């Protein structure tokens, strides 16, 4: 395995471990999720360039669109929780149910 793929995979694993360790705060979880999406985007972009398959070049762009949507929804939840309760704990998400 080339070193660049190993580094990107290591970045994904470190972000996953960060998500598991800091799951009580929403902001930390969102940052770790963004790190995971960035490493997946980089890995998909490198793989699509190396495969020389023209249809696979749209996959990283679709992943980037989903990452932007995930960030927007996450930040909206973070703002709503922090305005309502003043904290960014994930435990407060259960209180937002109707």
From Swiss-Prot:
The chain crosses the membrane at residues 1-21, 29-49, 61-81. GO terms for cellular component: mitochondrial inner membrane; respiratory chain complex I. One of its GO terms (molecular function) is NADH dehydrogenase (ubiquinone) activity. It comes from the Eukaryota. Core subunit of respiratory chain NADH dehydrogenase (Complex I) which is composed of 45 different subunits. It is found in: Mitochondrion inner membrane. The keyword Translocase applies. PANTHER family: NADH-UBIQUINONE OXIDOREDUCTASE CHAIN 4L, NADH-UBIQUINONE OXIDOREDUCTASE SUBUNIT ND4L. It catalyses: a ubiquinone + NADH + 5 H(+)(in) = a ubiquinol + NAD(+) + 4 H(+)(out). Keywords: Electron transport, Extinct organism protein, Membrane, Mitochondrion, Mitochondrion inner membrane, NAD, Respiratory chain, Translocase, Transmembrane, Transmembrane helix, Transport, Ubiquinone. GO terms for biological process: ATP synthesis coupled electron transport. Core subunit of the mitochondrial membrane respiratory chain NADH dehydrogenase (Complex I) which catalyzes electron transfer from NADH through the respiratory chain, using ubiquinone as an electron acceptor. Part of the enzyme membrane arm which is embedded in the lipid bilayer and involved in proton translocation. It is an enzyme of class 7 (translocase). Belongs to the complex I subunit 4L family. It is a multi-pass membrane protein. This is NADH-ubiquinone oxidoreductase chain 4L. Its EC number is 7.1.1.2.
